[in-house]
Amino acid sequence: MHVCEFCKKPFAKEKTLMIHVCEKKRRHLGRNEKHVQAGFMVFQKFFTIQQKSAKTKTFDDFITSPYYTAFVKFGSFFANTNPIYPERYIEYVIRSGVKLDQWCSDALYDQYVSELIKQEPADGAIQRSIKTMIEWADEKKSTWEHYFLYVNPNRLTHDIKEGLISPWWILNIPSGKEALQRLNDEQLEIVGPVIDPQFWKRKFKNYPADVELIKDVILEAKVQ
């Protein structure tokens, strides 16, 4: 008699057991898929933070959990979103108080980005903004210093909304502010929670050394 190690179902022949695929076995076979791995990572983090579990959850715990499907679904969302500061995003979602089945929400991620960029240090914001500009230049066969001169308004809207171009950067560059003026009303409404003029005016006033750092980088890089 041959028994499935996952569902404990008995089979008379080994060949029948080999082709048998129960739900737990299917989950086990998919353990190396990217979205499953992401879901498993978040599952472990959830029990560490929310349940204050001292014992690290295993993959066997994961595939037998009633929450497996929900975590894998979020794993797909996480992998596709490619969030900035991934660990911070996971912790943010877990501590948000939002129910697990509602984690795959663009609105929740937008809220995370909007709050995050107002808190992060200027140097991290600068590095990510320049990286985004370089990626754009590689795609367009251009130079990254010309990003604000030639970027498509839709692309600029996306990059700001996703936190890829920070207000630390765009609001301290003349061509950046000019690029914002090319956005239409709908696009301005989309980037509004990120480009919060009153907030950033106070921020720049309170952190003059960071503003000077940005201006030095702009001057040295000859951003146009």
Regions found by a protein language model. Give the residues of each.
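C-terminal recognition-helix end and immediately following basic linker
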Residues: 1-40
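Extended alpha-helical scaffolding regions
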Residues: 59-137
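Short, low-complexity intrinsically disordered segments
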Residues: 29, 45, 101, 134, ...
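Charged/polar, solvent-exposed surface patches and flexible loops
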Residues: 19, 23, 41, 45-49, ...
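Surface-exposed polar/charged interaction patches
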Residues: 46-49, 53, 77-84, 95-99, ...
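Long, mid-chain structured domain cores
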Residues: 107-177, 182-183
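Charge-dense, extended regions
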Residues: 149-224
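Charged, amphipathic alpha-helical linkers/stalks
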Residues: 29-72
